Amino acid sequence: MAMTVHCDIVSAEGEIFSGLVEMVVAHGNLGDLGIAPGHAPLITNLKPGPITLTKQGGAQEVYYISGGFLEVQPNMVKVLADTVQRATDLDEAQAQEALKAAENALSLKGADFDYGAAAARLAEAAAQLRTVQQMRKGK
């Protein structure tokens, strides 16, 4: 039997996942992080994007997070996220429309343009699309 670590994914709405996993892959500030049992302790920011859990037996679950924090301690991984959705609940067409709208907003800058908000909407829509694509790859 493969080694496991306990993983909790928590959002403002409550606990989304709690259980044993063989691996957690998340999108950190410096790239993707793979967390397996025995990983060194760590705390890091997470960017919007997919979180992939490899559960006991190799089954994978993919979630989308809009950002948050990852904490790794001996025998425990905790993800504290602003918003969490199961990848299967994401609407690819809606995410593509949001991506196009954000790209349009960035190209039509006016005097009252909020670049930070437009860039955040663009990053979130792109991360949702990346999550859907990653989920499809895993199937």
Curated annotation (Swiss-Prot):
Belongs to the ATPase epsilon chain family. GO terms for cellular component: plasma membrane; proton-transporting ATP synthase complex. The keyword Membrane applies. One of its GO terms (molecular function) is proton-transporting ATP synthase activity, rotational mechanism. F-type ATPases have 2 components, CF(1) - the catalytic core - and CF(0) - the membrane proton channel. CF(1) has five subunits: alpha(3), beta(3), gamma(1), delta(1), epsilon(1). CF(0) has three main subunits: a, b and c. Keywords: ATP synthesis, Cell inner membrane, Cell membrane, CF(1), Hydrogen ion transport, Ion transport, Membrane, Transport. Gene3D superfamilies: ATP synthase delta/epsilon subunit, C-terminal domain, F0F1 ATP synthase delta/epsilon subunit, N-terminal. It is found in: Cell inner membrane. Produces ATP from ADP in the presence of a proton gradient across the membrane. This is ATP synthase epsilon chain. It is a peripheral membrane protein. It holds the Pfam family ATP-synt_DE. It comes from the Bacteria. Its main location: membrane.
